[in-house]
């Protein structure tokens, strides 16, 4: 669920009421979903298009510092509702996430447009490394 807010302060102070979320999901007949709060308010310390946070306790993630899977659809949402305007058939959006939890990330969302449709979305960026490992078969 995408929830636009008016300011970075509102994003930073947002708290998820999980009981209310579960009630909404139950009333809609769906499983628990994540909640992505964001603002388009510019920041003084960065040039991000979007400042955001993602809450997904139903997936075992109280807060995610870099949600690539939610960022692509966010880009489509921003274009659909006129918050971002493509230039020459492309839009580039930068989402700053994870700041509140001390793990700032910068997610780049590149959107290709053709005939008013979105045939291509690419997501990449930078995140804080908190661990790494190797998986060996067998």
Task: Name each model-derived stretch.
Residues 1-138:
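Active-site proximal loop and beta-alpha junction motif in alpha/beta enzyme cores
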């Amino acid at each position: 669920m995408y929830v636009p807010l008016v300011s970075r302060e509102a994003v930073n102070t947002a708290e998820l009421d999980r009981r209310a979320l579960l009630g909404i999901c139950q009333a809609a007949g769906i499983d628990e979903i994540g909640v992505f709060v964001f603002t388009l308010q510019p920041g003084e310390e960065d040039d991000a298009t979007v400042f955001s946070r993602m809450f997904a306790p139903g997936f075992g993630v109280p807060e995610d510092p870099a949600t690539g899977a939610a960022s692509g659809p966010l880009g489509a949402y921003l274009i659909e509702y006129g918050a971002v305007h493509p230039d020459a058939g492309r839009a580039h959006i930068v989402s700053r996430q994870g700041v509140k939890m001390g793990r700032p990330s910068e997610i780049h969302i590149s959107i290709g447009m053709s005939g008013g449709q979105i045939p291509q979305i690419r997501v990449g960026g930078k995140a804080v490394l908190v661990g790494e490992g190797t998986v060996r078969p067998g």
